[in-house]
């Protein structure tokens, strides 16, 4: 029988419960204490009257709020869930100790090697799988996850080997105790990849939108995606305009048709015209064959014209003519071609200002500015920074075949205080660089290299209150707080700011910026 006792945190309570069992000569088989104010007891089966009396005694014990029977102890439930999970997994999975000897194997692994549960424990991983030296891997100075193609019984598998670290108590560092090996059938993976098709809904799910303003943009995009009129997406560089454009295409009725993108920046007119409208054979000196342009290739689908604000006046005129009726002529041909294409444009410039300066056709502007989406910069999406960080870190760790690092407690404030002039693209690239150079299992502020001129040290109205000395002190403290994350020692920070080590040490002490033992080295 098993009981779950709900109780208060009181010294001696567990001993009193055990005394109740001893007084009744009840055979105790196990006791577990949970951190949530619960004690679990496992003892031999009792007669109904004896059991009822015991329950009443437990309820009368000071500090006990309730008691009930449960089918399993927490450890039993955890073991059963783990066993059920291993049994349900179609991929062969087994664990090994530091000598590479098999400790546990699921039924799929037993079937693959044609060994039952007892016999497979007599084998080592090196004996079961050729082509990978498990012993040498586990003896290496830094054991990291590995992935490798292996052949077993004439079948191709992707083998993934992950080290297992455990700690005996909270004060000790994790110790390597063995490894977990998973074998993924390449044939099965191929079938799974065929089913992994991006749909109109899943593409929008890839867009992180925690900030209310960004959520509003995504919801607006879902609605505008269903229309056929030209769509204009405005946003700073790196905000994800191309990703939003693709999501709108996939959600629309054209989602199964082609989606092509052309960057209009710095393209000569003849190249831009050929790319968009195509050309006939002989239209150019080296054009031996005719070529379909983007509009013709994407017939029935969508074309993204990125950096539309950089398009030349000549190409603006040709684009306007195409938008009127969907007809155009290939370069070097006389007959017209008609296609059905939705045009999506993206820009980081203010097209209305370009119109006023005479740099963008007014009629084209009003032709494009029918449905508009404005993407906010990352500095205005502060709540999205950490979710984006977690996604990028997980993705890059998987790509590089390394364990996913923990994010330090200081990293949140570090990333959210930065101005991010390059927006999401800059965050993505900074994290990729950090993971390629990462030492250890934790990502810290000093692992991320960012241009210092974009540090957010601006002062708002509240920071402008007080005397000049008070304002200066707040600004100085903000500078030191921010730079100390990237230069975490007084000597490094002093060298960075071009002052003496003593001056920096005094300033850090003055502003209460903590120093750890040895950080002045």
Swiss-Prot record:
Domain named Sigma-54 factor interaction is located at: 207-436
One Pfam match, by short name? Sigma54_activat
| Top-level taxon | Bacteria
UniProt keyword annotation of Magnesium present: no
GO CC entries: cytoplasm
A Gene Ontology biological process in which this protein takes part is: regulation of DNA-templated transcription
Q: Which SMART domains match?
A: AAA (SM00382), PAS (SM00091)
Domain (ACT) ranges: 2-72
Keyword hit for Iron? no
> Where does it live in the cell?
Cytoplasm
What does the annotation give as the result of altering residue 201 to G? No effect. Loss of activity
Question: What molecular functions are annotated in GO for this chain?
Answer: ATP binding; ATP hydrolysis activity; DNA binding
List ligand-binding residues for ATP.
235-242, 298-307
Q: Which UniProt keywords apply?
A: Activator, Aromatic hydrocarbons catabolism, ATP-binding, Cytoplasm, DNA-binding, Nucleotide-binding, Repressor, Transcription, Transcription regulation
InterPro entries per UniProt = AAA+_ATPase (IPR003593), ACT-like_dom_sf (IPR045865), ACT_dom (IPR002912), Homeodomain-like_sf (IPR009057), HTH_TyrR (IPR030828), P-loop_NTPase (IPR027417), PAS (IPR000014), PAS-like_dom_sf (IPR035965)
Changing residue 402 to V has the effect of:
Decrease in ability to repress DNA transcription
Q: What does it do?
A: Dual transcriptional regulator of the TyrR regulon, which includes a number of genes coding for proteins involved in the biosynthesis or transport of the three aromatic amino acids, phenylalanine, tyrosine and tryptophan. These three aromatic amino acids act as effectors which bind to the TyrR protein to form an active regulatory protein. Acts by binding specifically to TyrR boxes in the promoter region of the target genes.
Q: Relate the assembly described in the record.
A: Homodimer. In presence of tyrosine (or high concentrations of phenylalanine or tryptophan) and ATP, it self-associates to form an hexamer.
The identity of this protein, by name, is: HTH-type transcriptional regulatory protein TyrR
Q: Supply the source organism's classification.
A: Bacteria, Pseudomonadati, Pseudomonadota, Gammaproteobacteria, Enterobacterales
